[in-house]
Amino acid sequence: WLEKFGVRNSNYLVADNIAIQEYIKINYGINSEFIAYGAEEVSDLSRNTIEKYLIEKGEFILTIARLEPENNLELMCDAYLSSNSEIPYYIIGNYQTKYGQLLKSKYKDTNIHFLGAIFNKEELDTFRFYANLYLHGHSVGGTNPALIEAMAAKAFVIVHNNPFNKSVVCEDNLSFSTKDDLSEILDRPNILSKREELSQKNLEIINSKYRWDIIIEKYEKYFLKILGNKKI
């Protein structure tokens, strides 16, 4: 009911994802302004990250996420374990929660490593840039910052198949709905042959739609329309 109250009692609505905009229109018959979250193409990498975390460039799979059920961590972990992948799977996110501890315990004797929360952007960008694959399991919540930040770092992203993610990545981006879907993708012998092409396409999307200067300009124009009492 909070959603309904907020939508129906707001003078102006901003949707950060096309799928959210469509949802509001279909369910409430109300128009909203689409303005997404922003990101910048990565240019600075942390020289010490590789040594600090003992990672090897291009020799790991990565996820950065809140450890919550809707982010499909178990699905991705189970898919990884059922695949033939031998490189480690690193998960960055706070595991000092009930669900985080459950995951850490469940996968403690595997090649899945929970690194905890990392807040240094250069370190996070270094992980994203050097990851072999980046698995994005978020299934709710519009445009997720972790996804566009991974795209901005030229990570080879594989996304959960839902309207929120699919409206952000390039049209032929790889996606999964089930454990078996993802396991099959991980086992494709030629999967890395698509890395440069798809990563570059997603980076072009960032630079054409999600750069912060573009986002800020959209907000400025929207606020000026509001101040000018123009119909929106």
Where are these regions (language model features)?
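Helix-loop-beta element that forms the nucleotide-linked donor phosphate-binding surface
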Residues: 9, 20-40
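Conserved donor-binding/catalytic core segment of Leloir-type glycosyltransferases
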Residues: 14, 54-71, 77-84, 90
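Short hydrophobic beta-strand element within catalytic cores of glycosyltransferases
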Residues: 147, 156-159
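Aromatic "clamp/platform" in nucleotide-sugar-dependent glycosyltransferases that forms part
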Residues: 138-139
